[in-house]
Structure formats: C-alpha cells, structure tokens
Curated annotation (Swiss-Prot):
It catalyses: ATP + H2O + 4 H(+)(in) = ADP + phosphate + 5 H(+)(out). Belongs to the ATPase alpha/beta chains family. The keyword Ligase does not apply. Keywords: ATP synthesis, ATP-binding, Cell inner membrane, Cell membrane, CF(1), Hydrogen ion transport, Ion transport, Membrane, Nucleotide-binding, Translocase, Transport. It is a peripheral membrane protein. This is ATP synthase subunit beta 2. One of its GO terms (cellular component) is proton-transporting ATP synthase complex. F-type ATPases have 2 components, CF(1) - the catalytic core - and CF(0) - the membrane proton channel. CF(1) has five subunits: alpha(3), beta(3), gamma(1), delta(1), epsilon(1). CF(0) has three main subunits: a(1), b(2) and c(9-12). The alpha and beta chains form an alternating ring which encloses part of the gamma chain. CF(1) is attached to CF(0) by a central stalk formed by the gamma and epsilon chains, while a peripheral stalk is formed by the delta and b chains. Produces ATP from ADP in the presence of a proton gradient across the membrane. The catalytic sites are hosted primarily by the beta subunits. Its EC number is 7.1.2.2. NCBIfam families: alt_F1F0_F1_bet (TIGR03305), atpD (TIGR01039). Its main location: membrane.
C-alpha cells in the first residue's frame, strides 16, 4: 500500500452515510477534490472527495466497501490523491486499484508512487507520424489495420468473442512486441482475470506485463478509478523508460457504467438512457491520456460492450469518437461459425489510406470490401430464388466472397484447449497474398472448407493440391 508517513494531520468526522456516499465534516481545513481519505478502525476504508458542499462539509465516494462505518467516526486526510505504483519492479505482477499486489506474492520493493490523476500530453509533445501495428490476425491486418499509439475498439454484445479476441491479441503481441503490456480489467469477471494470468504465465510472456483489476464485485468508485491507475503505470513506461506500451482495457463500457453509478449515488440529474451528464468529459479524461509522444507510444485496444447490440447507445457513440479503428463483432457471423466474428463491412480504420498502408494493400482491401458488399446484396436473391437465378458474373462474386469469408477465419492460440486446433499467427504479406489469389479465382476449384480455419493460403494448397491433381489426372 502507498506510504502515508508524510500524511496530512488534517482530520474530520463522518456525519452521514448513504451506501457508498459519505458526508464528512472538517472543522478546520477542507481537503481538495480528489483527495484520498481513510477511516475505519484499521484505516481500511478508503474514500475519495467528490464535491465540497460548503466551507466545512465534503461529499465523498467510497472506494472500498463501507461495512463497519458509522457516524461520528474519525476520518484522516492522506494529504493527496489516490496513488498507483510505478517502476520496473511492477512488471509480471497483478494489482488492484490501490496498488496492492493480488497475486499472493510479497509487495514489490523499490516502487515509486504517483497520482492516478494526470493531464494528457501537450499538443506540442504528440507525434504525428502514423505507423501500422500488426496483430497477426488476418482480417484485422488486411481490412482494419491498427495504429501505433492509437486506440482501437472491439464492439459487440454479450458472448460474441470480445474477451477471446483481446486475449489473442495479447498472446500475439506480447511475444513480438518489444515494449510493455498492461492489462486493465474494469468491471469484468474475476475468473477471466485469473485465467488470463495463468495463460500468460504458461506462455512465458508475463515478464513484460502488468495486470490491474477493478472487477465487478468491487464498489463503483474503485471500478471508476482503475483505468486511471493503469494509465499512470503506462505513462511511466512511456515517459520515463521511453518504451512502447500496449494497454488492453476490458471493458471500457464498465468504466462508463461505474461513472453512471457514481453519478446516480451523488444525485446528479441523469441524461439520455440514464447515463451521467458528464459522460463525454469523463471518457475524454481517460482516453486523451492514451497518446503517441516523442518519447514513446501507448497503443490501446479496448473491448466495448454494446448494450442489446444497439450501436446508437450513448456509451458506444461517445467511445466511437475517440477511436482510430473500430472492430465490430457480429452475432450472426458467430452463429455461422466464422471466428473471429468480425463484421468486415461495419468495421473500419482511419489507417486504411494509400499514404499509410501503400497502394497495393489499399486497392486490395477496397476490392475485398466491394466483393463482400455485393455478396451481402445478393443474399436476398439467393434466399428467394436460389443460386440458379444468378448471372455468371454474380456466381463468381458469390464464390469469391464465400472463400474470402472462410479464409478470414483463423484458429486462435487462446482457444486451443476448446477447439483442439493449433493457433496460427499470420503475417500481413501472407494474408494479402492469400486474398489476392482468391480474388484472381486461383481457388475456384477448391472446396470452401479447404480455406476454413487455416493460417496462410499455402496450407490449403499443400492439403488439397494432391487431391485436385488426382481428380484432374483421372
């Protein structure tokens, strides 16, 4: 836990408790907003100042459960805001929002403590050069390339594969990524965090990774601050160590949801659909700190739960505006077994321009999108009249699109235990080569199943070419 030897002697008294909301009376000096206060018999209850009611009273939100708290109890001002541990010694460790180690090991030695509330980098410090960040996942690298130092969102409802895709990206990137990876779990299942820790440990990539959790069983105040704590750690590695950082957030919607709970507890007037009126400001305070500067880059990939698959929900709309790439997961594709269940027509990236990814990649991506869009339009005709009513040109479009859809499926390392299929990491050049050959009808005689759940296109060739040669020779 953070050092309180230099804590302020300022103290107050609890005068009202309403769930996680605590009103405190300070007879002398009023603590500033965002100050961390401690109370309870063993100073185990941590409270953050949310607003100042008058010259003697503050209204606070509890960051820990308030069991045992009573009116009249003494409250001490810690003398500053919530702090997070930073330094090389936090690598390979797992923390909660307060910087306590939760991996059943001794607390790290020699850590520094910094405020979780920091300002975004100045505009003059931001790097403007755009670079592509490869993931090893075919559909993402070809159609919606990610930006180094940018923010990508994984949008989807419940059970379409957001966490699996995020975990796969960690697996692929931590191995080839020279920097540091920080996983921030906001309001998600404790079980997933424990599984992720074991997987990363087994894969041997934990040495360059930090995990921070504020899970769904914790009070809204803790879930609301854990994202800021993870960002403080990321900023240390970027600004002090000059290393690139991969920040993975699961789930940014739970951050917004925690803010909504805090807003409701504080009695603020709700905005549309019950969201807090300060939704845009709160999200910007977090997102704007994720940036690419001259000293290094923080690249962020964020899972975004979409309530009831409604992409007009204010939480989804506000998150969209901060992202350089949006990866939309489709329940329909998941039901068809096309994993990763990414919708190629709804997903997009600001990086997909000729000046950044090159003319060949751009033209190929546009041709793939056009083919898949034409196939989507033809599906209604096929459903009503059958394939026989299509023209020869439309037949070719359907054949190419269906083979592209299957080629874009990919077995994941993180699902090997469920599917019994070894995971595949595919380079961008191999993915582009495969798409180009499919669009040139090189695989029109191959069954669609030959392209399903493979890595590079050469796997289909080596597996089915002997069979085709035997058929042709007969």
């Amino acid at each position: 836990m953070m050092d309180r030897k230099n804590a302020s002697p300022n103290s107050g008294t609890v005068i009202a408790i309403r769930g996680s909301v605590v009103d405190i009376l300070f007879a002398e000096q009023l603590p500033p907003i965002r100050s961390l206060l401690t109370t309870g018999h063993q100073h185990q209850i941590l409270i953050e100042v949310f607003s100042q009611l008058d010259e003697h009273r503050v209204r606070c939100i509890a960051l820990t459960p308030t069991q045992g708290l009573a009116r009249g109890m003494l409250v001490e001002d810690s003398g500053g805001p919530l702090l997070a541990p930073v330094g090389k010694t936090i690598l390979s460790r797992m923390f909660d929002v307060f910087g306590n180690a939760i991996d059943r090991k001794a607390p790290p030695i020699g850590t520094q403590w910094r405020s979780v509330h920091n300002e975004p980098p100045a505009i003059a410090q931001l790097a403007t050069k755009s670079q592509v960040f490869e993931t090893g996942i075919k559909m993402i690298d070809v159609l919606m390339p990610l930006e180094r130092g940018g923010k990508a969102g994984l949008f989807g409802g419940a059970g379409v594969g957001k966490t699996v895709l995020l975990t796969e990206m960690i697996h692929n990137m931590v191995g080839q990524h020279a920097g540091v990876s920080i996983f921030c779990g906001i309001g998600e299942r404790c079980r997933e965090g424990e599984e992720l820790y074991r997987e990363m440990k087994t894969a041997g990539v934990l040495d360059n990774m930090v995990m921070v959790f504020g899970q769904m069983n914790e009070p809204p105040g803790a879930r609301f601050r854990v994202g800021h704590a993870a960002l403080t750690m990321a900023e240390y590695f970027r600004d002090d160590e000059h290393r690139d950082v991969l920040l993975l957030i699961d789930n940014i919607f739970r951050f917004i949801q925690a803010g909504m709970e805090v807003s409701g507890l504080m009695g603020q007037m709700p905005a549309r659909l019950g969201y807090q009126p300060t939704l845009g400001t709160e999200l910007s305070q977090l997102e704007d700190r994720i940036a690419n500067t001259d000293s290094g880059a923080i690249t962020s990939i964020q899972a975004v739960y979409v309530p009831a698959d409604d992409f007009t929900d204010p939480a989804a709309v506000h998150t969209f505006s901060h992202l350089s790439a949006s990866i939309v997961l489709s329940r329909k594709r998941a039901s068809e077994g096309l994993y990763p269940a990414i919708d190629p027509l709804l997903s997009n990236s600001k990086m997909a321009t000729p000046s950044i990814i090159g003319r060949r990649h751009y033209d190929l991506a546009q041709k793939i999108r056009s083919t898949l869009a034409q196939y989507a339009e033809l599906k209604d005709i096929i459903a009503m009249l059958g394939m026989e009513q299509l023209s020869p040109a439309d037949h070719k479009i359907v054949a190419r699109a269906r083979r592209l859809e299957r080629f874009f499926t990919q077995p994941f390392f993180t699902t090997e235990q469920f599917t019994s299929m070894p995971g595949k990491l595919v380079s961008l050049n191999d993915a582009l080569d495969g798409c180009e050959r499919i669009l040139h009808d090189e695989f029109k005689d191959y069954p669609e199943s030959a392209l399903y759940m493979i890595g590079s296109i050469d796997e289909a060739v080596s597996k089915y070419r002997p069979k085709l040669d035997r058929v042709n020779s007969q």
